Amino acid sequence: MRVRGGQEAAQDKETSLDSDEERGRRGLRQTTLLDYMAGPAKPKKPEPPPTLHREREPESKYQNTLPETTGKEPASMSLRRNQPSSKHEEYNSESGDVRGLTLEPSPQSELSDDDVILELVREPWVESVRGYLLDVRYDGSLGKAVLMLYDPSSGSLVKWADRTGHKPYFLTDARPEDLRAAGVDVSHDESFLQYDLVEKFHPIDRKLVKLTKIVVSDPLAVRRLREKVSSAGFSVWEADIKYHHNYIFDRQLIPGILYEVGGVRIVHTLPLEMDDATRIVDEIFREEPREVRERAREWLRIFEAPPPKLPLIAFDIEVYSPIATRLPDPSTAPYPVISAATADSSGRSRVVLLYRDGVEFTEGALPEGTEVEIYDSERAMLLDLVRILQRYPLVVSFNGDNFDLPYIARRLEVLGVPREFAPIELKQDYATFRRSLHIDLHKLFGIRALQVYAFGNKYRELSLESISRALLGKGKVELKAPVSELNLNKLIEYNLQDARLTLELLTFSNNLVFNLIIMVMRTSKLGIEDITRSQISNWIRGLMYWEHRRRRWLIPSRGEIEKLSSAGARVGAIIKDKKYRGAIVLDPPVGIFFRVLVLDFASLYPSLIKQWNLSYETVNNPNCRDTIEVPEVGHRVCREFKGISNEIVGMLRDFRVRLYKKKSKDKSLREEERLWYDVVQSAMKVYINASYGVFGSEKFSLYSLPVAESVTALGRAVLRGTLEKSRELNLHIVYGDTDSLFIWDPPKDVLNDLVDYVERTYGLELELDKVFRAILFSGLKKNYLGITEEGDIVIKGMVAKKSNTPEFIKDEFSKAVKILSKLEKPEDVEAILAELRDHINTVYNNVKKKVYTLDQFAIKVMLSKNPREYDKNTPQHVKAAMLLQRLGLTLSRGDIVYYVKTRDKLGVKPVQLARLSDVDPGKYVEHVKTAFEQMLMAFGISWDDISGVRKLDRLLFDS
């Protein structure tokens, strides 16, 4: 452990928070170690937040966020005055003991702030390299696309500027003379470069078309000129594609694989020999046309290429805040960063701390293997932090886009680092580095398709705690005090745990999530910073556009595709916010069933897309003569040519089912290979299962209502036919949902007959998904609780898993689930019900007697906007926030409000102002009822049938 000296000038004696802006305007200056040793003058005190007089001990930890009115100012946030010491005791990493440690500056030579900044802004340009393509950016100062590649030989990220002469453009059906005649001669625009005549195949019209390509020097000019051209009555195409995406599509780049770049050459290197690829593809796709097999061989080589192994670093910062429930505003960065932790893929952990008077180490060990440095200069600390981060090709954060990076960037500006020297780049909707790439796991794990198909809905809340608990089995360090009040031991432990969790979420199970990202990049043809921040519709769009360019197809306009919807939907929508009818969901029974098998149609919708040749250009296309009608909805599907969606989805499905699912379980392969193949098949699963849905989303650029409607209609026909056959075979179907059947204790031979029927009739595979030894149905759709033969609990819709559920409800529901997990056989039901009844009665008694603490009753909600912006229908958490504002506390968007439900007219109080006596038990009855009522329905008893509940309700509401 060592103390790092700052770079403040000797005459700059003011070191309080209030002087940051003023010191920042003076620019960058160096000082000597002797200046640092002299120490700062007594600092000014920051303005204390509004105070509240308290005459009682706090009943909630959140009440500590309101300061006492003692007349004393809060502890200052000054830089440390370091005095020379004759004794220097190093941190003992073996014992972990920090007692008696003397903190003093290191006499070793240090980089000045200026030197660090020069290192941070130095660009890693190369003329040639052999490396993995991770991303493509547009550099406005160069007017060129820039490839971001990981160079394994140096272990660093390098940049290569395009030398192929690629420029922004868009297409129109207007000839140059037509534009001049219409008074929109774009050749006079300052960004105009040239007109080109190009020929493209129109996938809907089924013919070659000649178009004018308007080439410009600036991507922003595309938007400006396309409006002029279209307003003159001409059609435009491919004018809304981001330039760096256009570059990838035109150059047919595949992010995530190895390239050799130099001169004007950009050539990928794939390990699998073409002869081997031909043999495997011919076996799987023997019935497909030659051109499809050729494309499949290229796909196979991409899938077989092993993923890169990059040095990774995760980081997290902690910021001082005078109000514990407030997240400091990153746009102004008013308070200092007091701690920052990093954890890298080599196992190295670092924590940098800002020295603060009165904040010391206590007894106890620091986290094992941790390097700790203490700075008297926040600016030097932050510059060193970013310098460390940018040494890695890939930086990982959790919510770094919205908080950590914007805060650091703005804070450096406050501390005097000019914006043009800032190492962090703040984009419109994300943040990154000049010399590194950045992944924000908060956005990655918020991608719905990954949450459902890759991680099986294991997490519901998009918090580091929730996701880590679900995927890693561990979580954040629990705190009993606000971060700003922690001693250094606890601050280090808390901060470092967040960084380590962030890294582990990317690297657990042999780099599972990172490898999944690489596979999605290769499939979507998008860079790493794009795919980790966008929903799957953008992934599919990237793949579709890339394939259009490969085939020299024109990407049709939205209006052209919508014309094919003129046949209209024949079945009304029954799903909220959808324009087409969805899948069949059977009405479930009420009760408990033992030994229920769940059978799934393997990749039902992707299989139907392949079988029926469904694609935006094949459904209702007037230029096709040979068609077949989709039952129930009446759309006509072309059989003269293969649709692009049919080919892509079908190919991914066949690769997954017929090759990679098997390879992922092949014990003859090395474990590393099996794990990679499991990632490959998982990525394919994500793609193919979302493929039909995007065509039914109006936000999707290739939106096609007839395609989405045809897929679900065919799915309903398959499920109805299978149900009829099940009845013929005397199988007891207790429930069905979209592509799943819940069958009660079926004979094995009869079940095999059903599987054979589905394969013969529909060409689909009916697979065993899971076996429940017991399952509880409440009678509501998509609402059940099952215990598998392995003892795993599967809960569907039975409890609200929202972050604003009172903590005691979550705990008590988990205890109830543990009781239900004891169900083994019908004879257990009576005893389990009795135990469950006792548990619920205990919960009610605890609510009535207020056994739970104020914090357990608290409901936590984040403000989505400033309280003053609510003019009507004010939510409860906003009412609580307004009470705090009346005391002088400033609350804004992003602040977390903790409140309880009370007996008074307003009905709520912030926890800071509440006492247990204020809590209204009757209002919490509804929370308990919501959590347990559906569970009880499965036992065939009503809410009031439980002994004591009716009486207890009356007592609660009347007391």
Curated annotation (Swiss-Prot):
Q: Which GO terms describe its molecular function?
A: DNA binding; DNA-directed DNA polymerase activity; nucleotide binding
Any one Pfam family here would be DNA_pol_B
Give me the gene this protein comes from: polA
Domain of life of the native organism:
Archaea
Name the record gives this protein: DNA polymerase 1
Which species is this UniProt entry from?
Aeropyrum pernix (strain ATCC 700893 / DSM 11879 / JCM 9820 / NBRC 100138 / K1)
Tell me which EC number(s) this protein carries. 2.7.7.7
Class of enzymatic activity (EC top level): transferase
Please list the reactions this protein catalyses. Answer: DNA(n) + a 2'-deoxyribonucleoside 5'-triphosphate = DNA(n+1) + diphosphate
Q: Where is the sequence biased in composition, kind Basic and acidic residues? A: 44-60
